[in-house]
Curated annotation (Swiss-Prot):
S-S pairs: none
Annotated Acidic residues bias: 64-85
Composition-biased stretches (Polar residues): 90-103
Family annotation (InterPro entries): Miracidia_Ag_8I (IPR026240)
Organism: Schistosoma japonicum (Blood fluke)
Name recorded for this polypeptide: Immunogenic miracidial antigen 8I
Similarity annotation: Belongs to the immunogenic miracidial antigen family.
Region feature (Disordered): 61-139
Coiled-coil intervals, chain numbering: none
Amino acid sequence: MCVRRVDILSRFDIALSLLQSLTHSHTVLRHLCFLPTIIYKHLCEFTISFSSPVISTGQHIDVGDEDYHDGDDDVDYTDDVDDVDDPHGSPSQLLQGGYQRNQHYGGGNYQSGYYRPNKQHGNGYGGQYPKKYGSGYKH
């Protein structure tokens, strides 16, 4: 082990003396003291430039069953209640349709955040108002 260490030191000395004889200047030798620091700095910059930071783009990633509806998932929202004869339906059927729809959102009528009536039920007011006075949500 000692022989190897001496061998490395002697090679360093040879390189140093060769460099000194080539330049005839002590300026290069002074800058050689900072060489390890400069190499380390460049290695750190190289590593940082090739790492991939995680940047949030704010885009929606579809993960399947969601607790909210943002238009990106592929659940069919029109076929939840098929047994309604009247296009508006009775209040209980409207609630049932809302409950079945909101099962996509994780539970009961109001647990999911908002109630969106089934399209085949009109605007959700049982025909009392014209469709344009519905919930304000474009169905």
